Regions:
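Bacterial N-terminal signal peptides
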Residues: 1-8
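Boundary at the C-terminal end of the N-terminal hydrophobic targeting segment
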Residues: 8, 13-15
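Regulatory alphaC helix of protein kinase catalytic domains
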Residues: 16-25
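A small-residue-enriched
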Residues: 26-94, 115, 206, 233-305, ...
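Amphipathic alpha-helical coiled-coil segments
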Residues: 37-52, 119-144, 153, 160, ...
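Short, charged, amphipathic alpha-helical segments
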Residues: 103-106, 169-177, 375-383
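Periplasmic alpha-helical coiled-coil/stalk elements that build and connect Gram-negative outer-membrane
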Residues: 116-235, 335-338, 342, 385, ...
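Metallo-beta-lactamase
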Residues: 189, 241, 395
Length: 416
């Protein structure tokens, strides 16, 4: 009975053209403002790569000299000896400073992209949990409606037995009074479904779609097989974005250390200028050229502190990556245990308990209708069947949630 209801739930959702998980996921990643803001941060880091690779601008200097400011030997010709010197200078960066700056910026962008993917990974877990809760609420509502339909048939049979003198009025009254429990369950299921839809719409940042027009559809079942734990561990080592960010941080730290060493080297400034009517020892040197090389003497400042800091940062990044690796294994192991435990609980329900509860309910109902069982036995059988149904649905919901947790721990969808 339960598998039929689960399938009917999926068919009902499809008739309402509900959103599938892939559609919900795509809509979330497209519209979520938190993800969009974080992606803008990655785009900013990408733009900083341009700045990091820029060459130093050449410098232009225009200087004037040789203007007489006071008479000499009663001669004052202030502008006769004036000359103007246009100068071009350029700082030449040595030891691949520019290339190392670009490499560090590119590695920073890759770290930012990995962190963005990690944010997406964590937020998708919350979205998937809300999606599963909505599916579960829909299944519970369908089960409650099916139980009420079945119980209404029992009430009709009881009234026929009353008219035939085969059942007392007090027993019929007790049966009809218990119908209120089914009505309460339906109303509670309706409220839970609506609440789950509202929470899912909130995560989607959708305040325009009416709740009544929003629905989801998907497979609400479990898979009885699970790959070995080592397979999931290996996938996580390759796919977890936070671990990839930690490993890329090591690379950036090493690049920054190379850059610190490079920044400790000397960068000469090369200058050249032209002079007309210059004051020099050559009386015929009206048009002259000059050049200079300015070399800082790195006697005291050789960037020692930054070299030491970046060396320490390499060790820190390596330790952080080991901690991230340990966290990955812990997350995968914990989630794997939850999934495996839920599968172990679900298998006997699917193989035995569901059919057994249905068989007991139908057998006791038949016996009660023919005087072979008491009213209390009949009502207990109805209650036991509903409890088994609900427990099975709740276990499937727990399985799907733990599967989402395993997907998050691994870093990609390994269980649909």
């Amino acid at each position: 009975m339960v598998p039929v209801l689960l399938y009917a739930c999926g068919s009902h959702a499809e008739a309402q053209t509900g959103y599938t998980w892939d559609q919900i996921k795509a809509k979330f990643e497209t519209d979520n403002p938190t993800l969009k803001a974080d992606q803008s941060n990655v785009d900013e880091m990408k733009a900083e790569e341009i700045t990091a690779y820029l060459r130093p601008n050449p410098q232009f200097t225009l200087s004037q000299d040789g203007t007489q400011i006071a008479p000499h030997n009663n001669v004052w010709q202030p502008l006769r000896g004036t000359y103007v010197v246009p100068t071009i200078s350029y700082l030449h960066e040595r030891e691949h400073k520019r290339e190392l700056r670009l490499e560090s910026a590119q590695e920073g962008t890759r770290i930012g992209q990995a962190q963005h993917q990690d944010l997406d990974r964590n937020m998708l877990f919350g979205l998937r949990t809300a999606f599963v809760a909505t599916l579960q609420a829909r299944v519970v509502l369908d089960l409650a409606k099916a139980d009420l339909d079945y119980y209404d048939k029992i009430i009709d049979i009881s009234r026929n037995r009353l008219r035939a003198g085969d059942l007392a009025q007090i027993d019929v009254d007790r049966i009809e009074l218990l119908r209120v429990q089914y009505e309460v369950e339906i109303q509670s299921a309706i409220v839970n479904l609506r609440t789950a839809k509202i929470q899912l719409l909130q995560l989607l940042d959708d305040n325009k779609t009416p709740v009544e027009q929003f629905d989801v559809t998907g497979r609400f079942d479990f898979t009885g097989t699970l790959r070995p734990l080592d397979d999931f561990r290996q996938i996580a080592l390759n796919a977890r974005p936070d671990l990839q960010a930690a490993l890329q941080t090591i690379q950036q730290s090493e690049t920054n250390h190379k850059l610190a060493i490079s920044n400790g080297s000397t960068d000469p400034t090369i200058s050249g200028w032209y002079t007309y009517n210059s004051s020099n020892n050559n009386p015929n040197g009206l048009d002259t050229l000059g050049a200079s090389v300015n070399i800082p003497l790195r006697i005291f400042d050789r960037n020692q502190g930054e070299k030491q800091r970046t060396q320490i940062d390499i060790a820190r990044s390596q330790q952080a990556s080991e901690a991230a690796r340990a966290q990955v294994f812990s997350d995968v192991d914990t989630a794997y245990t939850l999934v495996d435990s839920n599968i172990a609980l679900l298998k006997p329900y699917k193989d035995k308990y569901n059919d057994q509860a249905l068989r007991v309910r139908d057998t006791v109902t038949y016996a009660w209708q023919h005087g072979g069982a008491s009213l209390m036995d009949f009502l207990n059988a109805q209650s036991d069947y509903r409890q088994v149904q609900l427990a099975y649905v709740q276990l499937i919901g727990a399985y799907l949630t733990s599967a989402a947790q395993l997907n998050m721990a691994v870093g990609q969808e390994v269980i649909q």
